[in-house]
Structure formats: C-alpha cells, structure tokens
C-alpha cells in the first residue's frame, strides 16, 4: 500500500534531538514554540513524523489540537488530553507502561489499573506527571497544537501555568523531564504565550517551522497519477505562490481528473494545472477580501491598523486612535464616526465575530489569519 503521507524524517530527528536534549541549559527545557501558517503541513508532521521519532527514543508523548474542537474550552482540552491519553490502551504512554512491565501505576499514592488510569481528585498536574515520569524512568513530551488558543480563556491560561509548574518540577534532577512543544499558525499570537514575564512560558525558545519545499513537490508530482508528469520547476513556483499549502495543489489536481491516465501534449497539463492553481488562489483571496469589503468604515479602519502594526498593536493607545482616524478619512471621509474607545471596542468585537480578529483573555488582539495582512498590502489597502 502506498503511503499517502509525505514524511520528513530528517527534520523529525533534528527536532527530536533538540527536544530531548538533556543538557542542563538546553533551550527546549523551557519549552519549544514552533510557528507556521495554517494548512502548511505542520500538524501532519507532528503526528506522522515527530511523535513517532520521540516515541522511538523512549519518550511518552501526549498530543492535543486546540483548534480541533472550538467549542471545547482550551484549559479543559489540555486536562482532558492527560486523562484520555492515560486511559487509552493504544496511547503512546501506555505502550511505554507495558514496555516497562507495569501492570499498575501509582499516582500520588493512589493505584490505578493500567486500563483505567486517570487523574485522581486533588492530585495536581505536576504531581501526577512527576509520578508517572518516575515510574517510567522516561521523559514526557506534551505537544499542544494551535497553542495560541490557550491564551483566549482564563482556564487556558491557568492550564499553561499548571504546565509550567509541572515542567519546573519534572525538569529538576529528581525526575526525568517534561518537554512542552507548542505550535501555532500565527507567530504574533504564539508570541503572546512567551513574550512577557507575566506569561507562563516567558522567553521559551521559538522558531519558524520550516515550510515544505522541493522534496514535497517532487513527491506530489510522483503521486498525481497523470500520464505526463508535471514540470518540477513550474510546480515548485506555483507551490510557493500558494504559501506552501499542499491542499491548494490537491484542489487544483482535482480539477484535472479528466486528464488522469490520459495522454496529453507536453506542457498542456502544466498549463491547465497552473490555471487551476491560480484559480484556487484567487478564489481564496476573494473570499477574504469580500469579508473586508463588507465591513463598516470604522471596522475597516481598525482592521487596517491592526494589520499594519502587527505585534506592536495596542488597540486603545493614542497612536492607534490617531491611526484609526487617518485610515477612516481614507476609507470614507464622510463617515461621521467619532474615534472613541467605546466605538473601537464595538468594532473589535465585530471583527472577532466575523473571524477576522483574534482576542486573548487579557485583551490583546491580532489578525485571525496572518496571511490577510499580506493580501491587503498586495491590494493597496495598507500603507
């Protein structure tokens, strides 16, 4: 059976080395934050490559995607992760349990049958994970995908501080280590979790997740089923134009179904594929721009300032209020809207409701999709 997943084993090994380094001053001991745009293969890599590489080295791995169920409060999702991972017979943690020859695991003085392992009432996350790590004599790696959503609720923030306490305890000389790997689809939003001393993972290591490249393009071409192979260089250029998003290439390929297995003139398939990719990009761009065009003048002004200021955006700062007025005058000089904090608050709430803006629990705002700023700039909507 042909593997439907493109694998990145070398990258997985490199990150596994960094995550599991036992050097006392290894940056990953404080946490590793990986940022990459949404739909660029990050989550697939975590599940299909990095997780197996870590398990192969003896680590117990827990994984949760905070984007998977938007209705589930992020803090509860993290707690549920620990409980469900311990309870599932096929979880990486229980595999390590059995490999260690454990039939029962004692957590905080309480015995649980392996098939029914859970967190007992009154046992802190730090105490439970420390006891488990000690019994396994192995490090625990906790992967939190789309981790920025933890910052949107008080429960999520509390869970992060609980994990910080667990990290500090397990990374002491008395235990075997806890590594937190947090990923996010927006670098500015992910940065909020480690940019301030008031945050749980202040100054944790952060890096840009390497995008898919030529090797993915060649794998894609080899698996299209087309009689005439696509030109690798042209396809690579198209892939870069998509923002390195595999689903756009797959969508475009789906529009060439009538060509699969049929002989075509040299270059004809490439031309049609390029048209299909460009069409898919235009369709996606138009959907975002349509939402922008539907905004009120003040909402549009606030969105433009947010996109322009990026990580420095402070919604109620004097410089932002002045920037709103400037943008509003450009959008609609006759709008007749006063730039006052209550009006700005209403505009921000509307942008959040339209999924154009994202709000952290402590009041920070950022674009929901970072690519929107680049699109708006390309269309002359930003200074």
Language-model features, listed with the residues they occupy:
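Walker A/P-loop-proximal flanking segment of P-loop NTPase domains
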Residues: 1-37, 44-53
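P-loop NTPase nucleotide-binding core
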Residues: 30-141, 147-156, 325-334
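Amphipathic alpha-helical "lid/sensor" segments that cap RecA-like P-loop NTPase cores
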Residues: 222, 226-286, 297
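Conserved catalytic network of the ASCE P-loop NTPase/AAA+ motor domain
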Residues: 24-26, 54-56, 132-136, 168-176, ...
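Sensor-1/coupling segment of RecA-like P-loop NTPase cores
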Residues: 149-196, 209
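Helix-loop-helix "sensor" segment of P-loop NTPases
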Residues: 192-237
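Alpha-helical DNA-recognition elements
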Residues: 52, 255, 350-353
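C-terminal leucine-rich, beta-strand-based interaction scaffolds used for sensing/assembly
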Residues: 282, 286-383
């Amino acid at each position: 059976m042909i593997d439907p997943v493109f694998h990145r084993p070398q990258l997985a090994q490199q990150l596994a080395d960094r995550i599991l380094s036992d050097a006392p001053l290894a940056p990953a001991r404080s946490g590793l934050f990986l940022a990459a745009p949404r739909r660029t293969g990050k989550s697939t890599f975590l599940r299909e490559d990095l997780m197996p590489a870590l398990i192969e080295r003896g680590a117990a791995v827990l994984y949760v995607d905070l984007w998977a169920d938007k209705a589930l409060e992020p803090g509860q999702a993290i707690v549920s992760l620990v409980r469900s991972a311990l309870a599932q017979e096929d979880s990486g943690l229980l595999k390590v349990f059995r490999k260690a020859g454990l039939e029962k695991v004692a957590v905080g003085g309480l015995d649980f049958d392996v098939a029914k392992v859970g967190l007992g009432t009154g046992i802190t996350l730090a105490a439970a994970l420390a006891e488990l790590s000690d019994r396994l004599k192995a490090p625990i790696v906790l992967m939190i995908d789309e981790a920025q959503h933890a910052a949107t609720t008080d429960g999520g923030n509390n869970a992060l501080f609980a994990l910080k306490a667990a990290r500090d305890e397990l990374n002491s000389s008395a235990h075997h280590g806890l590594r937190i790997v947090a990923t996010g689809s927006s670098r500015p939003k992910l940065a909020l979790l480690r940019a301030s001393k008031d945050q749980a993972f202040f100054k944790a290591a952060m890096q840009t997740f390497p995008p898919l490249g030529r090797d993915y393009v060649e794998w894609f071409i080899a698996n299209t089923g087309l009689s005439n192979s696509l030109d690798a260089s042209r396809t690579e250029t198209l892939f870069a134009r998509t923002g390195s998003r595999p689903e756009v290439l797959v969508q475009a390929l789906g529009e060439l179904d009538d060509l699969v297995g049929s002989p075509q003139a040299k270059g004809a398939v490439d031309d049609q594929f390029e048209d299909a990719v460009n069409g898919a990009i235009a369709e996606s761009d138009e959907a975002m721009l349509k939402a922008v065009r539907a905004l009120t003048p003040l909402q549009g002004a606030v969105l433009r300032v947010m996109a322009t200021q990026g990580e420095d955006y402070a919604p109620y700062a004097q410089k932002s209020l002045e920037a709103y007025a400037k943008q509003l005058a450009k959008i609609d000089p006759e709008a007749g809207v006063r730039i006052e904090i209550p009006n700005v608050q209403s505009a921000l709430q509307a942008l959040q409701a339209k999924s154009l803006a994202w709000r952290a629990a402590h009041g920070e705002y950022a674009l929901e999709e970072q690519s929107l700023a680049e699109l708006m700039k390309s269309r002359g909507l930003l200074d």
